[in-house]
Regions:
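Loop-to-helix junctions at membrane interfaces in multi-pass transport proteins
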Residues: 2, 37-40, 44, 61-75, ...
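Membrane-embedded alpha-helical core segments of multi-pass
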Residues: 13, 17, 58, 83-90, ...
Length: 249
């Protein structure tokens, strides 16, 4: 069978698995919908969070950004990852402690202020819409390549699938679906990384290939041949103030 047929089979099987998990995880009360009955194990929650991070934005955009910008792309990676860490340490634990389901409810009750609640609502909407726009664009690109449709149709298909998980299973369905996606994404990352490392350096472990071979020098030379700065050159076209604000943003 051709690579296209194998791709179709594997993607179809994985999607059928996601749909089955979403159906089995359907909920009937608000606690199950918003906080997955507070019964998801820590390891599963970690896997789901990892799958969220390894989303379309990371899998497509972040990988391309670092590949194109080299060391300069690390400022986006550090800011993005740092935001996840701050959220996990400074906000997420206290939502459960306060018994709240949403960030605006928590902020409003914590600071006894409806103004703070409104500010939290505006911030949540702004951040969510910005993130979702990039995510859905990535979903549209993936479906357009896979189903041979235009990107707009791919976005619509992705919206329908996401709505199915969110409406039927709430956070419980989304969490367990993300756990399954985590496994798929890890494998999808490892296969090309191992293959490229083996072909270029003969070392099948990407971390060792990057450390103990001349792959960095080759990347630097490719960048120079294309008229760009070296792959490992740090912040060649940015001031430290630019770097600081991009990382914070």
């Amino acid at each position: 069978m051709s690579a296209e047929v194998w791709t179709f089979i594997l993607v179809t099987v994985s999607f059928m698995g996601y749909l089955y998990i979403g159906w089995r995880s359907r909920v009937q009360d608000s606690k199950g919908f918003f906080v997955a009955d507070q019964g998801v194990p820590a390891i599963a929650n970690g896997a789901a969070t990892g799958a969220d991070w390894m989303s379309a934005a990371s899998f497509i955009s972040m990988a391309g950004l670092i590949s194109f910008l080299g060391y300069d792309g690390s400022i986006y990676l550090m800011g993005w990852t740092g935001g996840y860490v701050l959220l996990a340490l400074l906000l997420a634990p206290y939502l459960r402690k306060f018994g709240k389901y949403t960030v605006p409810d928590f902020v409003g009750d914590r600071y006894y202020s409806n103004v703070a609640r409104i500010v939290a609502v505006i911030a949540a909407i702004f951040v969510s819409m910005t993130y979702v726009a990039g995510q859905m664009r990535g979903v549209g690109i993936v479906f357009s390549r896979f189903l041979q449709v235009d990107i707009g149709t791919g976005v619509l298909i992705g919206m329908i699938i996401v709505a199915f998980f969110a409406i039927l299973g709430g956070m419980k369905g989304i969490t367990w679906t993300q756990v399954a996606q985590y496994t798929v994404l890890i494998i999808a990352y490892l296969i090309p990384a191992i293959a490229i490392a083996t072909v270029i350096t003969g070392i099948p472990i990407p971390q060792f290939a990057f450390t103990f071979s001349d792959i960095v020098e080759k990347l630097n030379q490719v960048q120079l041949d294309l008229g760009f700065a070296e792959y490992t050159a740090a912040f060649t076209n940015k001031t430290m103030l630019d770097v600081l604000f991009i990382t914070i943003a």
